[in-house]
């Protein structure tokens, strides 16, 4: 097998409409044309799933995923103002990262690499 690309990331939520609104209005990601429970990034779809509606326990994703932003500090303040929890900010010597939790407690990493890989 050869994986061609990542098509979507499934994100648990207790309220699909609220999750879509947060990622659309705060992160500026457009809603999907094909499914009301999704938003689009330039290279992967974020798909929201209400596990409790399917009779499953809700458990937020703690591993997270990273989205590239122009200014990590400014992005962190934007999500904080929208009600998200800021967990921490880190500078690794290669990139800046802001670790936040969305309105459902899912980890989201606001990221900007400033040094080349290597």
Language-model regions, residue ranges each:
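Vicinal oxygen chelate
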Residues: 1-2, 11, 76, 80-118
């Amino acid at each position: 097998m050869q994986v061609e690309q990542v098509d979507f990331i499934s994100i648990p939520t207790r309220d699909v409409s609220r999750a879509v609104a947060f990622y659309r209005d705060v992160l500026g990601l457009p809603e999907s044309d094909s499914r009301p429970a999704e938003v689009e990034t330039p290279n992967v779809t974020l798909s929201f799933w209400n596990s409790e509606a399917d009779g499953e326990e809700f458990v937020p994703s703690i591993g997270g995923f990273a989205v590239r932003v122009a200014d990590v500090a400014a992005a962190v303040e934007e999500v904080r103002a929208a009600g998200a929890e800021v967990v921490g900010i880190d500078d690794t010597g290669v990139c800046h990262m802001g670790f936040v939790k969305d309105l459902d407690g899912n980890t989201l990493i606001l990221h900007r690499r400033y040094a080349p890989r290597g």
